[in-house]
Structure formats: C-alpha cells, structure tokens
C-alpha cells in the first residue's frame, strides 16, 4: 500500500534537515562587547590559540565612594576540546579600589540563538587585619549578554 505524503510536510522536513545542523554548530565567542544584568560593561579582545585574552571592564556598581574607572581584565578560555560553548575565567584588577574580582563561567547559545555568558564571581577586598578576613570576600553571579551596536 502506498501512502500519499503532503508536499507541505516534505518541505517542512527538508527545511529542518537543512537548518538544524547549523544551529547546533554555532560557536559562542567571548570576543566582543558585553553588558550584564546590573549594567556593567566589558570588552573582551581576541582569544589567542592558547585560549588567552585581555580586555576592559567598567562596573556599574561599587561599595566604595571612589570614582569608578575602567579596569583591565585578563583571562583564559578552555581550548582542550574546542567546544562550541566554552568555559572560561578572568580576573579584573580594579583601578579605583584595593580589590580584585575573579569570574568563572560558560559561554552559551540560548534557545533563541543569542550568546549568553553565565558567570559566578568572587570579589576580594583588602582589609587591614586578619581578624577582618571573614568580611573581605563576596560572591555573586552575573549574566552577560552581547552589547549590540545601533547598527545591529
């Protein structure tokens, strides 16, 4: 017995077969301009063959009364398996306070095809006495999305 198949169904199946491989192969790239859920911005330069990168970070929040200044960041991306959604870490050496923040996370392509950086951070502030060590480290999470230019 022969079944007639709808031309529309065949077209749909063919479309899915052609589009699906492209969606799964898209690689999340750290390079570029990013903004997080608090309004902080960072720019990450090109990732070299060893997975190393540099950039700048300008925070939108601070616990100090000092003027916020753009601060350098240095990091690495895991390159062992050339994954499409790589893990990474970077350090920000704040230029306006005696503190350093380390971020670790993963670069994802979300269900809408957008790049997202899901991160966790530790901020270490300087204290004058070891007795104050307990209050010197803070922990948090940030979600970064690619900062779009007006042309996009």
UniProtKB/Swiss-Prot annotation:
One Gene Ontology term, aspect cellular component: extracellular region
Q: What are the disulphide bonds in this sequence?
A: 28-107
Gene3D superfamilies found in the cross-reference section: Avidin-like
Show the GO MF annotations. biotin binding
Q: Which stretch is the leader sequence? A: 1-24
Which tissues carry this protein? Synthesized in hen oviduct and concentrated in egg white (where it represents 0.05% of the total protein).
Boundaries of each Avidin-like domain copy? 26-149
Q: Which InterPro entries match?
A: Avidin, Avidin-like_CS, Avidin-like_sf, Avidin/str, Avidin/Streptavidin-rel
Q: Which PROSITE patterns does the entry mention?
A: AVIDIN_1 (PS00577), AVIDIN_2 (PS51326)
Under Pfam families, the record lists: Avidin
Using the UniProt record, give the first listed, main subcellular location: secreted
Q: How is it modified after translation?
A: N-linked glycan at Asn-41 consists of GlcNAc(beta1-2)Man(alpha1-3)[GlcNAc(beta1-4)][Man(alpha1-?)Man(alpha1-6)] Man(beta1-4)GlcNAc(beta1-4)GlcNAc.
Q: Which UniProt keywords apply?
A: Biotin, Disulfide bond, Glycoprotein, Secreted, Signal
UniProt binding sites for biotin: 57
Q: Where is the protein localized?
A: Secreted
For this chain, the family text in UniProt reads: Belongs to the avidin/streptavidin family.
Q: What is this protein called?
A: Avidin
């Amino acid at each position: 017995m022969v079944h007639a198949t709808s031309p529309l169904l065949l077209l749909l199946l063919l479309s899915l077969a052609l589009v699906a491989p492209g969606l799964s192969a898209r690689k999340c790239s750290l390079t570029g301009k990013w903004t997080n859920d608090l309004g902080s911005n960072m720019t990450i330069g090109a990732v070299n063959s060893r997975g190393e990168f540099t950039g700048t970070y300008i925070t939108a929040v601070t616990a100090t009364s000092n003027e916020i200044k753009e601060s350098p960041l240095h990091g690495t991306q895991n390159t062992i398996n050339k994954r499409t959604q790589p893990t990474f870490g970077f350090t920000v050496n704040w230029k306006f306070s005696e503190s350093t923040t380390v971020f670790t996370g993963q670069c994802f392509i979300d269900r809408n095809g957008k790049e997202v950086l899901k991160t966790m951070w530790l901020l270490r502030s300087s204290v004058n006495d070891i007795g104050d060590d307990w209050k010197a480290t803070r922990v948090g999470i940030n979600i970064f999305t690619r900062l779009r230019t007006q042309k996009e």
